[in-house]
Amino acid sequence: MILLFIPVGILAGILGTVTGLASLASYPALLYFAGLPAVSANVVNKAALMFNSIGSAVSSTQELHGHWKELFKTMIIIFFGGITGAILLTALPSSSFTHIVPVFIAAGGIMILIPSKNEEDHAGANNFEPRKGHVNQHSWLRNILIIFLVYLIGAYSGYFGAASGILLLVLLTRTSSNEYTVSNAIRNVAMGAANIVATIYYSFEAHIVWILVLPLGIGFFIGGYIGPKIVRVLPVKYIRILTGILALILAYTQFSAAYNIKLFYLF
């Protein structure tokens, strides 16, 4: 049964690096196949997700060429935001946030469906040269706002986390002239900082079922390596559509669970 989580991790890792929704596959599997309670499943999922970022980093060197400084800055902000989220988690139960989470997820899903004006919609051409000067083209006030928003996303990821990767991708694609594949690569690796924070926090405050983290993490690493290669060859518009649809489905399920309202007969 434990080895089952390797293919689960591969599927979740691909979903995570392509759409930012790894938990759509991994979290339910931990609940139903492993029989973990919700909190324990979230802990295992966060710990295993670190390997997804590692696999993505190994696979995305082409996209990240010339963008390592930008990635490092984003990771630092996400890291400190994640610390804030972990601290808030000790003071506020995550259940207090469940009623507005569907709004965040739905907003991210809708925004990802709308291409940014700075983005070139290409079908996988290997054109990853960094664009000179794009970092300094914003005013200092806008830069501060971007830093603050990245920090908030990091805090949200450390506190609750659902679809935080989509929110970061939406922000990155709208605040830089990077191609979609580059922003996606930065998102995939940078979000690992929040998962590192969460894992360190849970190591002291909760019990981590490491026997499940290992096979799931192996799968996440493999899926994280495969995902960027898929993004590299698929047209961006199809990735956007898939991500948007999955995000809206997740938003509905979160809405249904939070408000105990079912708009459809089966779910």
Can you describe what each PLM-predicted range is?
Residues 1-37, 124-184, 214:
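Selected transmembrane alpha-helices and immediately adjacent juxtamembrane segments
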Residues 2, 46, 101-105, 109, ...:
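Residues within membrane-spanning alpha-helices of integral membrane proteins
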Residues 32, 40, 90, 99, ...:
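Transmembrane helix-loop junction
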Residues 37-45, 68-73, 177-188:
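Membrane-interface alpha-helices at helix entry/exit sites of multi-pass transporters
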Residues 43-99, 195-241, 245:
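Selective hydrophobic functional segments
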Residues 55-65, 102-135, 249-265:
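Transmembrane helix exit motif
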Residues 84, 152-159, 198-206, 213, ...:
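Hydrophobic alpha-helical transmembrane segments in multi-pass integral membrane proteins
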